[in-house]
From Swiss-Prot:
Principal cellular location given in the protein's record: cytoplasm
Gene: pre6
GO biological process terms held by the UniProt record: proteasome-mediated ubiquitin-dependent protein catabolic process
InterPro entries: Ntn_hydrolases_N, Proteasome_alpha, Proteasome_alpha-type, Proteasome_asu_N, Proteasome_sua/b
Location within or outside the cell: Cytoplasm; Nucleus
Organism field: Schizosaccharomyces pombe (strain 972 / ATCC 24843)
Protein name as it appears in the record: Probable proteasome subunit alpha type-4
């Protein structure tokens, strides 16, 4: 088995490319990132690791601008993501220079996935240990678009999705609570609440970007995230109190009837 997991382009006897699977494992060990569509907005949220006190926080940004209308978030190896982001930015600029038109979200996703796929077949390299979430609005179109790419070079369109170590729990939460036609505030609220299911309840551990058609991307300040977190916690406490009073109500009713 050791020969197969060292060779990039050699299949194991059961049809697996083990180096690609190791890249997927690097993604599963990465911090969580989510992206979801609203009615006419996109919200991208990522879990941020605790940063040493003397380190510049800007070096740990997990949401990058590829073009004015395209954002990319990732889970996995930071250095690998940096290479993919740089390649995506160059491709977006080349497309604009050659065709005098901004790149479409699907085209850019297909390009990034193509780069990842090439690194599963080429000699002298290894697969990227990164999954990406590519989101934005095509110029002149108000349709929100969210795509996910994987180390194997696969890409898919999503209404809401999650990647990283807690992606399963976050995606299950999104599946239960996401619906068509969410307003901007509802989409932001759902993004934060889904991240709170898997990260520590502090604004410093959450990075949030909101995209609207034809507007600059808005990165929410920690104070705003704090306010949303408090609202969600208050709602949970109120819901727990309602459930508790609902359970105790039958007992009270029975006692009064006997009296």
């Amino acid at each position: 088995m050791s020969g197969y997991d060292r060779a990039l382009s050699v299949f194991s006897p059961d049809g697996r490319l083990l180096q690609v699977e190791y890249g997927q494992e690097a993604v599963r060990r990465g911090t969580t990132a989510i992206a979801l569509r609203g009615n006419e907005c996109i919200v991208i949220g990522v879990e941020r690791k605790n940063v040493p006190k003397l380190q510049n926080v800007s070096n740990f940004q997990k949401i990058a601008m590829v073009d004015n209308h395209v954002c990319l978030a990732f889970a996995g190896l930071n250095a690998d993501a940096r290479i993919l982001i740089d390649k995506a930015r160059v491709e977006a600029q080349n497309h604009k220079l050659n065709l005098a038109d901004p790149v479409s979200i699907e085209y850019l996703t297909r390009y990034v996935a193509g780069v990842q796929q090439k690194y599963t077949q080429s000699g002298g390299v290894r697969p990227f240990g990164v999954s990406t979430l590519i989101a934005g609005f095509d110029v002149g179109d108000n349709t929100p678009r969210v795509y996910q790419t994987e180390p194997a070079g696969i890409y898919n369109a999503w209404k809401a999705t999650a990647i990283g170590r807690a992606s399963k729990a976050a995606r299950e939460y999104l599946e239960k609570n996401w619906k068509e036609g969410l307003s901007r505030d509802e989409t932001i609220h759902l993004a934060v609440s889904s991240l709170l299911e898997v990260v520590q309840t502090a604004s410093g551990n959450i990075e949030l970007a909101i995209m609207d058609p034809g507007k600059d991307v808005e990165f929410l300040h920690s104070d705003k995230i704090d306010t949303i977190v408090k609202e969600i916690q208050d709602e949970k406490e109120a819901e727990a109190a309602r459930k508790k009073s609902g359970r105790s109500a039958p007992g009270v009713s029975t006692t009064s009837t006997i009296q």
